[in-house]
Amino acid sequence: MKKITALLLVLVMTLSLAACNGTTNTPETTTEPTVAGPASALEVLETIWALYTDDNKFFAMGGDYETPVDGAPGAVNLAVKDFLTYSLLIPEAELAGVTEAASLMHAMNANSFTCGVYKVADVAAFAGTMETAVMGNQWMCGFPETLVIASFGGGYVLVAFGVNDAMNPFLTNLQTAYPAAELLVNKPIA
């Protein structure tokens, strides 16, 4: 009789736990998701460039003066300071804060399209400095029409400027490749 009572008790407890669905009333804890960001500055440009169809690709080059890459983005050697300041318009005072860089440029006219992606410690300060530098630049041999600055997780900042025919497809590919990227600046260059 004791065995039957014990079995009935186990059966009743099992059914009651099943009815409660085994849930407990513990408070939910939520954490903000972290944005990991890209693995490298070069990865950002390679991912965006890969979205171009052959019909949309322009005659491009990447890298820097010493290590150019034909027809694709390339990593920038940070020791080539004149390329960083002259071609990518990074103010010399900001160079120490850049720990990684990659570039993609129109091979015939850099003012038609130039893009750099940089790893920096202070994204907001660097973006503000770059906006001021590009907007205040004295242009020769063609004038870029649009400036775009975007940030990614991990301290990566993209700065691109050029004519609208080059910038519009680039911006579309940027937003397709990195929908979580924060567009900090998207404005005409006056």
Functional labels for PLM-detected ranges:
Residues 1-8:
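Bacterial N-terminal signal peptides that target proteins for export
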Residues 15-19:
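C-terminal motif of bacterial Sec signal peptides marking the signal peptidase cleavage site
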Residues 11-12:
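Repetitive helical segments and hydrophobic/amphipathic motifs
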